[in-house]
Amino acid sequence: MMLKPSIDTLLDKVPSKYSLVILEAKRAHELEAGAPATQEFKSVKSTLRALEEIESGNVVIHPDPEGKREAVRRRAEEERLRKEEEERKIKEQIAKEKEEGEKI
């Protein structure tokens, strides 16, 4: 049975097979917890989805701990801004519906 993505392709993306296992496990946990996907998947299982993301280069190991912290901060800020925008749109919709209701 041939595994997709292949182990050889994946090992080109990370320094060692141990790093690959850790990266795959962490990303699979993130996906299970509801983290946004970086691409469309062929696989159903989160572990295989994580490997697909690693193969495509969308998920990488940060050799620099500060770089990882910055990426986490940036992701948290993007999520905060997305939620604020969503709340703003909901409030606008409520105000619009309320205004239309008062006109009747």
UniProtKB/Swiss-Prot annotation:
MF annotations from Gene Ontology: DNA binding; DNA-directed RNA polymerase activity
Keywords per UniProt: DNA-directed RNA polymerase, Nucleotidyltransferase, Transcription, Transferase
Domain of life: Bacteria
UniProt region (Disordered), positions on chain: 60-104
GO cellular component: DNA-directed RNA polymerase complex
InterPro entries: DNA-dir_RNA_pol_omega (IPR003716), Pol_omega/Rpo6/RPB6 (IPR006110), RPB6/omega-like_sf (IPR036161)
Bilayer-crossing regions: none
Pfam families linked to this entry: RNA_pol_Rpb6
Enzyme Commission number(s) from the entry: 2.7.7.6
Name of protein: DNA-directed RNA polymerase subunit omega
Originating species: Streptococcus sanguinis (strain SK36)
Gene that produces this protein: rpoZ
